């Protein structure tokens, strides 16, 4: 395991990033496996996007400025982890309202601890874990037109496509999207009983939201935030499928 240092300033940021990247390159060359998140922090709306800045950091440990060549020795393999239920969903919705209503709002270390504990130990329902194709294979297959030299943005997009294409979607995902659209596009993959259960679940999560004195939960806003969290994986996967067919 290794520590990603945050809240650094100026030149310290570059030095820490280079040191971490060099460590990762050395570890991979020694035959070790490393796991790293695709972005800093958590996606609040379940739209998973790889940060190009992360790929730039990973490339710092190589002896070339060519992004593709710099990342090649790391043997990057995208991994998709799908939860039926996100135990932190109400905390994310709560944070969205606080950011909307409280100028300059920032989470405290205690908030981070609650989020981490809830994310680890909270109930997730069914969980799917899919190991995708290596980045080198995604590049060589040419499923998407690529211009050389590859930019970190193009590489991030390839990683995202592989992750999104292997999402496991659950009834709650389709139901959330249909509730937002007001049309039952995906009725064939869920039942009225499923829909009733999801509606009850969403309302129960809103009840868990706790705001500072003087603020009232905006139930409609919170409801939409929660529905979007569960709908976005469907949209991301559909977008990837459409791009693949094009």
List the predicted regions and their residue ranges.
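Conserved nucleotide-cofactor-binding alpha/beta core module
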Residues: 1-13
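Structural motif
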Residues: 3, 35-37
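Membrane-interfacial terminal anchoring regions of lipid-handling membrane enzymes
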Residues: 12-34, 43-246
């Amino acid at each position: 395991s290794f520590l990603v240092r945050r809240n650094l300033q100026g030149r310290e940021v570059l030095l820490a990033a280079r040191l971490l990247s060099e460590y990762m390159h050395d570890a991979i060359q020694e035959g070790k496996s490393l796991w790293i998140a695709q972005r800093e922090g958590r996606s609040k709306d379940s739209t998973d996007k790889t940060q190009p800045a992360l790929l730039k950091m990973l490339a710092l440990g190589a002896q070339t400025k060519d992004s593709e060549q710099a990342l090649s020795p790391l043997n990057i393999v995208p991994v998709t982890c799908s939860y039926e239920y996100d135990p932190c969903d109400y905390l994310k919705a709560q944070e969205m309202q606080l950011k909307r209503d409280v100028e300059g709002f920032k989470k405290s270390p205690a908030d981070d601890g609650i989020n981490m504990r809830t994310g680890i130990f909270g109930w997730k329902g069914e969980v799917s874990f899919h190991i995708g194709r290596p980045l080198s294979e995604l590049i060589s297959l040419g499923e998407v037109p690529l211009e050389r030299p590859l930019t970190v943005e193009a590489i991030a997009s390839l990683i995202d496509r592989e992750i999104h294409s292997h999402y496991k979607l659950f009834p709650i995902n389709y139901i959330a999207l249909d509730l937002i659209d007001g049309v039952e596009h995906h009725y064939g993959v869920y039942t009225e009983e499923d829909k009733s259960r999801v509606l009850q679940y969403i309302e129960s999560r809103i009840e868990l939201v706790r705001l500072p004195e003087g603020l009232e939960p905006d139930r409609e806003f919170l409801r939409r935030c929660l529905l979007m969290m569960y709908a976005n994986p469907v949209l991301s996967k559909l977008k990837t499928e459409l791009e693949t067919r094009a």
